[in-house]
From Swiss-Prot:
Naturally occurring in which organism (per UniProt): Oenococcus oeni (strain ATCC BAA-331 / PSU-1)
GO biological process: 'de novo' IMP biosynthetic process
Pathway it works in: Purine metabolism; IMP biosynthesis via de novo pathway; 5-formamido-1-(5-phospho-D-ribosyl)imidazole-4-carboxamide from 5-amino-1-(5-phospho-D-ribosyl)imidazole-4-carboxamide (10-formyl THF route): step 1/1; Purine metabolism; IMP biosynthesis via de novo pathway; IMP from 5-formamido-1-(5-phospho-D-ribosyl)imidazole-4-carboxamide: step 1/1
Name the record gives this protein: Bifunctional purine biosynthesis protein PurH
Gene, per the UniProt record: purH
Recorded superkingdom: Bacteria
Length: 509
């Protein structure tokens, strides 16, 4: 008869699994709550204490940390010395170990959880047994996932416990314990950039392909859910998102997070805003975002920060969109939008601010890590450096434009008026070209006479200020900081335009 040790916090499928093991000539030993759960269901099982001859102590902190458990897991069956040692100490080998760990993640997700509560949910015995069993996976079947129970029972029944199958379970176990420890380390870490960066993500699903069809890809979600995360979105209608959909939707959600004070709509293509509109109603905000660029929006993504109503849905229904994201949809809005088979409708929880977390970007051989750009632009932080002073309306427009340009790929120039982007110049190697592209889109707009201009970084020369002023711009905001700032200020004064320094750069690569 073989022996299996079962000690789990997640009891899904456990009864059927234990019964299947008994049917295949396994003796069951167990601990604490798992033992009680099994015996109450009529499954015959022995307590670990019967095996070790030692009781649980320290309120359950020490249950399985015993040589009769770990030797039973670690002994190599083909090693005669190992087996002789087991016999001398009257230790029966353990052939299968099923363990899942104390719910540390679920504990720290609870509101107002204390440090002591979190610490008490750090499993010690479980990871120790798993590591012992996984090290000896050639002889011990190691199980961390209830979803594997059926395949394991089938393999046992068919005597098909191949090397590859055991290796698969072994690797899965070490990933499981590594992720568990990474989560604990992250919770306890106070250093922003510790000497070891431990991160853990859970696989969500495989993608058909990555950025291009020749690239494989999959989606992994943060172990702890975050606000504004596209990976926490609920798909109400349509198929799963693609790699590019996810990247674009993430960029759109990051953008709209800066505009929670009023109803706002962001349209986006290829991780750049196509249009941003802000108004007193979500319908009017849609109108502004749509007319900001009614060409680029085709096949794009739309994110709204208020519930989608019928009037807004009727307007969106007339054009081809890939994805619409909002906190919610009225029943009437949903019914009209869901008529389009290939349109995805998603809901995402939106709070006042983005979560504070580090951003990781892979480079060959490693990663660069930085704090997320969560800076909130405020007119109180602006410095007027020109002789001309902004009106209240201009100042409001400058704040809006500076918030928006933060989300455009560098070199970034954005022209805006009255809560609406009019023209966006993105991703050019030199700033003056971005200026010209922005003007190409903006000049024909009916409210261009009210337009202001924002730049994500300083002007290295005065040519951008000169071009903007000569083409009708009356107010400009930029970070400042160039060795030639004086030239830009002089040009602004010469041409009578307002120049404001925000002192905050927003490069986006």
């Amino acid at each position: 008869m073989k022996r299996a040790l079962l000690s789990v916090s997640d009891k899904r499928g456990l009864i059927d699994f234990a019964k299947g093991l008994i049917k295949n000539n396994y003796e069951i030993i167990s601990t604490g709550g798992t033992l009680k759960f099994l015996t109450e269901a009529g499954v015959k099982a022995k307590a670990v204490e019967e095996i070790t001859g030692f009781p649980e102590i320290l309120n359950g902190r020490v249950k399985t940390l015993h040589p009769k458990i770990h030797a039973a897991l670690l002994a190599k069956r083909e090693n005669s010395e190992h087996m002789k040692t087991l016999e001398e100490h009257q230790i029966t080998p353990i052939d299968l170990l099923a363990v899942n760990l104390y719910p540390f993640k679920e504990t720290i997700e609870k509101k107002d959880v204390s440090y002591d509560q979190a610490i008490e949910n750090i499993d010690i015995g479980g990871p120790s047994m798993l590591r012992s069993a996984a090290k000896n996976a050639r002889d011990v079947i190691v199980v961390v996932d209830p979803d594997d129970y059926d395949s394991i029972l089938k393999a046992i029944a068919n005597d098909d416990l191949s090397h590859d199958f055991r290796r698969h379970l072994q690797a899965k176990t070490f990933r499981h314990t590594a992720a568990y420890d990474a989560l604990i380390a992250d919770y306890l870490s106070k250093e922003e950039y510790p000497e070891k960066l431990t991160v853990t993500y859970d696989k969500d699903f495989d993608l058909r392909y990555g950025e291009n069809p020749n690239q494989t890809a999959a989606v992994y979600a943060d172990a702890i859910p975050k606000a504004y995360s596209i990976l926490q979105a609920k798909i109400l209608h349509g198929k799963k998102l693609s790699y590019n959909n996810i990247k674009d939707a993430d960029a759109a959600l990051r953008t709209i997070a800066d505009f929670q004070d009023q109803p706002t709509v962001v349209t986006l293509k290829h991780m750049n805003p196509a249009g941003i509109g802000q108004a007193i109603t979500i319908e009017k905000a849609w109108d502004k975002a749509f007319y900001a660029d009614d060409i680029s929006i085709f096949g794009g993504i739309v994110v709204l920060n208020r519930e989608v109503d019928l009037a807004t849905a009727q307007k969106m229904h007339t054009i081809f969109l890939e994805i619409i994201i909002a906190p919610g949809f009225s029943e009437e809005a949903y019914q009209i939008l869901a008529k389009k088979k290939n349109l995805r409708l998603l809901t995402v929880a939106m709070t006042n601010t983005l979560p504070k977390e580090l951003e990781l970007t892979s480079v060959l051989g490693g990663a660069v890590v930085q704090e997320m750009d969560r800076l909130v632009e405020n007119a109180a932080d602006f410095e007027v450096v020109s002789s001309a002073k902004p009106t209240d309306e201009q100042l409001e427009a400058l704040v809006f434009a500076q918030k928006a340009v933060k989300h455009v790929k560098s070199n970034a120039i954005l022209i805006a008026a009255q809560g609406q982007t009019l023209g966006i110049g993105a991703g050019q190697p030199n700033r003056i070209d971005s200026v010209k592209i922005a003007f190409k889109h903006a000049e024909a707009k009916k409210n261009f006479d009210q337009a202001v201009l924002a730049s994500d970084a300083f002007f290295p020369m005065d040519d951008s200020v000169e071009f903007a002023a000569e083409h009708g711009i009356k107010a400009i905001v930029e970070p400042g900081g160039s060795i030639k700032d004086k030239d830009s200020i002089a040009m602004a004064d010469k041409l009578g335009v307002v120049l404001v320094f925000s002192h905050n750069r927003h490069f986006r690569h």
